């Protein structure tokens, strides 16, 4: 099973990473999981967020679990001066139905003067891309390290959209949940100005 850049397999009811290497960024990604053992032996269930969405209707509890899990992990990266280019549902691993982890070492980039350098080609039709990626026409290009929060906000709305399919736009979905405690968090992630995007949880 491929989740992000991790090739994960199950043997004797335990999960293992098949493509472990000694690359510094890869090892930092594994450390960011903060699990009891790196061989995933404490895990009883594991799936990608893309598959998890097909089985579970997102609610307030699930959404808050996702945000809190990613907040802790992203803080781990930020302390080491790293950020993410962008994320989507195929980059997120769900452990034991309540822990959500970013798993793509290829999208981890070092921060220099508050910015990250995008060097990889990407698909402009990806619905999770920040607007700056869509309007950009050159590779490489620099962008604020906080730009990817937009991806996070859209990803959460996409998960909620699977529950309320009658809501046709992300704006309608966000407005529908304006009384929930994660509303402000998502609103801050979706700030039109990338330098003003914030990931704050309550």
Where are these regions (language model features)?
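Activation segment signature within eukaryotic-like protein kinase domains
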Residues: 66-67
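Conserved end of the kinase activation segment
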Residues: 133-145
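Short, conserved alpha-helix in the C-lobe of eukaryotic-like protein kinase catalytic domains
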Residues: 151-161
């Amino acid at each position: 099973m491929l989740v992000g850049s991790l090739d994960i397999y199950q043997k004797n009811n335990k999960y293992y990473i098949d493509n472990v290497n000694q690359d510094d960024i890869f090892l930092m990604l594994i450390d960011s999981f903060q699990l009891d053992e790196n061989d995933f032996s404490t895990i009883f269930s594991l799936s990608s967020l893309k598959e998890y969405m097909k089985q579970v209707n997102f609610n307030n509890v699930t959404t808050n679990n996702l945000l809190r899990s990613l907040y802790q992990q992203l803080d781990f990266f930020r302390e080491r001066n790293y950020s993410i280019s962008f994320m989507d549902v195929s980059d997120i691993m769900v452990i034991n139905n309540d822990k959500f982890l970013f798993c793509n070492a290829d999208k981890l980039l070092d921060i220099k003067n508050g910015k990250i350098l995008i060097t990889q080609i990407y698909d402009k039709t990806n619905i999770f891309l920040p607007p700056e990626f869509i309007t950009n026409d050159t590779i490489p290009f620099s962008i604020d390290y906080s730009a990817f929060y937009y991806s996070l906000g859209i990803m959460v709305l996409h998960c909620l959209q699977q529950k309320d399919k009658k809501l046709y736009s992300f704006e309608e979905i966000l407005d529908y949940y304006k009384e929930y405690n994660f509303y402000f968090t998502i609103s801050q992630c979706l700030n039109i100005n990338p330098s003003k995007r914030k990931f704050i949880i309550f």
